[in-house]
Amino acid sequence: MREATVERATAETWVRLRLGLDGPTGGKVDTGLPFLDHMLLQLQRHGRFLLEVEARGDLEVDVHHLVEDVGIALGMALKEALGDGVGLERYAEAFAPMDETLVLCVLDLSGRPHLEFRPEAWPVVGEAGGVNHYHLREFLRGLVNHGRLTLHLRLLSGREAHHVVEASFKALARALHKATRRTGEGVPSTKGVL
């Protein structure tokens, strides 16, 4: 079974995260930031993963550190759980609508970290539970850099912060589910490694 547990501790945050790509789904999520918990549960449900997260951060300062470090821990766990990449689908894309919002996520479990996401171009109004689309960028940057994947996220329509962030997590979850499936033999690269 492809699974990993990571722990990350800094002067600003503490994160313990368990990710399972196969087998049972679900798991308890408690970060101390209810909206982040809600988003991680979207990732868990729509990605069909086992995802358990316990985290604490300096929320009295800002949500930035906690959101970013949970993304880093998720990336670390994803990289470890994927192992050598044998049999992976590797590439995936997913759309996620939520009322007026439509988001597209395209990713490649390439071993090459790159995030293509420009929140300054998104016409989003406000934030949801202290989290906005700039915090989403920090979460994704942590995931991409430590999970070593290429990720493109596009907002096709929408302005309401809650819907934009939630649709982004749902699209990410669906794309990750597809890309992490084992559908073949060997490493899906002409180089022989990811």
From Swiss-Prot:
One of its GO terms (cellular component) is cytoplasm. CDD domains: IGPD. It is an enzyme of class 4 (lyase). Gene3D superfamilies: Imidazole glycerol phosphate dehydratase, domain 1. Pathway: Amino-acid biosynthesis; L-histidine biosynthesis; L-histidine from 5-phospho-alpha-D-ribose 1-diphosphate: step 6/9. Its main location: cytoplasm. GO terms for molecular function: imidazoleglycerol-phosphate dehydratase activity. It is found in: Cytoplasm. Pfam families: IGPD. InterPro entries: IGPD_sf (IPR038494), ImidazoleglycerolP_deHydtase (IPR000807), ImidazoleglycerP_deHydtase_CS (IPR020565), Ribosomal_Su5_D2-typ_SF (IPR020568). It catalyses: D-erythro-1-(imidazol-4-yl)glycerol 3-phosphate = 3-(imidazol-4-yl)-2-oxopropyl phosphate + H2O. One of its GO terms (biological process) is L-histidine biosynthetic process. Keywords: Amino-acid biosynthesis, Cytoplasm, Histidine biosynthesis, Lyase. Its EC number is 4.2.1.19. NCBIfam families: PRK00951.2-4. Belongs to the imidazoleglycerol-phosphate dehydratase family. This is Imidazoleglycerol-phosphate dehydratase. It comes from Thermus thermophilus (strain ATCC BAA-163 / DSM 7039 / HB27). The lineage of its organism: Bacteria, Thermotogati, Deinococcota, Deinococci, Thermales. The gene is hisB.
